[in-house]
Every structure is written in structure tokens, then in C-alpha cells.
């Protein structure tokens, strides 16, 4: 089935270039040029991936993403595109549940690689002899079906491997509400038991980093 990608970009030439490139790769691409237009389209149609330029007219993409999550319970992966050299903006994006980001100017081959991470149907090798595929963890040949929240947590860590992720970002992405710290620690403990205690680092007062050896 053809994957559908939604692109929000107010630079018409860049939008057309990205659209043409992605269509050549076999994706179905829909474009919007401002936040209001994007909101209206996303209110009636679902996509497999969102590419959102942060600074667009009428409603910036951070506000757009927050609204579509709250109004339509959309959990589609989103890659933010930004020309801003502003770590606070990126932090806000990840706190909202962003899956990834690209900084302008970006290479189209890099964009392709980022997108394929979300559409790859092959098992992901987490570390030697440990694979993950569609809620199933294979550890040295032994298969373990992960509960939905545990699987979502692992997938979020895989998307942000090597990055420090705040507890708030994990809460927003997986529960979309405040939870007890003990709840998150329980899920972390389950993954550590399956993958090894050193695969998830705790950065006290900051968050966690998934760093499998």
C-alpha cells in the first residue's frame, strides 16, 4: 500500500522540489503552505508521516502539532524542519512528541534516509542477536511479545537512539498526560531486564538515553 506523506512548507520552490523527489521514490505527497490550511486538511485526512516546517504563516507548526494531537488524537510520526538555530525550539518539539528533525538546508538523500526509518518493514537490529519488529522482541532466538506501552517506549527510544530524552517528552508521547515517575521507571525497568541494564542510561534530573552497545 502506498505511503501517504503530508508536507507543510511555505517555500513554494522547496515544497515542489521535495514533493517531486518523494513521489519519484513512490510516496503519495500532499502539500500545504500555511498552518491554517494544514490544520483543515489534517482534520479530515490521515497520513503515514508529517513533514512540518516550523516557521510558516497563520499558525506555526508547533502550535499546529499540539492542536491536531489534542483535537483529533493524531499520533502520526512527525519530522520537524527548521532553519532556526534554537535548541529551545527543538526541545519544545520533542516535548510535544516529535519523532525527528531536519535543519535547513538539508540534503534530499538525508531526508530519504530519515523517512525510511519510519517505513522500514525489516526487523531492527538493536544489538547483536537482539531484533525488534512490530511489537515483537527477539532475544537470541527467543521471541517476546511486548505490551503496547512497552513497545511504544522502545520504538520512541529507537527513534531517538543516542539522544537524551526528557521524562516529560516520554510522558507526552506515550501517555499525553502527567504520570507518576514510578510508572515510567517501571517500563524502563522492563526494557532493561530484556535488553540489559546498561542499554538505557539515567541522566539524573534530565531524562534517559537509549544507548545499546
Curated annotation (Swiss-Prot):
Record PTM 4-aspartylphosphate, positions in chain: 53
Keyword tags: DNA-binding, Phosphoprotein, Transcription, Transcription regulation, Two-component regulatory system
Domain of life per record: Bacteria
UniProt GO BP: regulation of DNA-templated transcription
DNA-binding region as annotated in the record: 121-212
UniProt-listed PROSITE patterns: OMPR_PHOB, RESPONSE_REGULATORY
SUPFAM superfamilies, per database record: C-terminal effector domain of the bipartite response regulators (SSF46894), CheY-like (SSF52172)
Gene3D superfamilies found in the cross-reference section: 3.40.50.2300, Winged helix-like DNA-binding domain superfamily/Winged helix DNA-binding domain
Known role: Member of the two-component regulatory system CrdR/CrdS that induces the transcriptional induction of the copper resistance determinant CrdA. Upon phosphorylation by CrdS, functions as a transcriptional regulator by direct binding to promoter regions of target genes including the crdA promoter or nitric oxide-responsive gene promoters.
The name this protein goes by in its record: Transcriptional regulatory protein CrdR
Species name: Helicobacter pylori (strain ATCC 700392 / 26695) (Campylobacter pylori)
Amino acid at each position: 500500500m502506498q505511503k501517504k506523506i503530508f508536507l507543510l512548507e511555505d517555500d513554494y520552490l522547496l515544497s515542489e522540489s521535495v514533493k517531486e523527489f518523494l513521489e519519484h521514490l513512490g510516496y503519495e505527497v500532499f502539500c500545504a503552505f500555511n498552518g491554517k490550511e494544514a490544520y483543515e486538511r489534517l482534520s479530515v485526512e490521515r497520513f503515514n508521516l508529517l513533514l512540518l516546517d516550523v516557521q510558516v504563516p497563520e499558525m506555526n507548526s508547533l502550535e499546529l502539532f499540539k492542536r491536531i494531537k489534542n483535537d483529533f488524537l493524531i499520533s502520526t510520526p512527525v519530522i520537524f524542519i527548521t532553519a532556526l538555530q534554537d535548541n529551545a525550539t527543538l526541545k519544545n518539539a520533542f516535548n510535544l512528541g516529535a519523532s525527528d528533525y531536519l535543519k535547513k538546508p538539508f540534503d534530499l538523500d538525508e531526508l530519504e534516509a530519515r523517512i525510511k526509518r519510519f517505513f522500514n518493514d525489516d526487523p531492527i537490529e538493536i544489538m547483536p542477536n537482539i531484533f525488534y519488529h512490530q511489537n515483537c522482541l527477539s532475544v537470541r532466538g527467543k521471541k517476546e511479545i511486548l505490551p503496547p506501552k512497552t513497545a511504544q517506549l522502545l520504538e520512541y527510544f529507537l527513534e531517538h537512539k543516542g539522544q537524551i530524552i526528557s521524562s516529560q517528552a516520554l510522558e507526552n508521547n506515550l501517555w499525553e498526560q502527567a504520570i507518576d515517575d514510578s510508572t515510567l521507571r517501571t517500563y524502563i525497568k522492563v526494557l532493561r531486564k530484556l535488553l540489559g541494564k546498561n542499554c538505557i542510561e539515567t541522566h539524573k534530573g534530565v531524562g534517559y538515553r537509549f544507548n545499546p552497545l
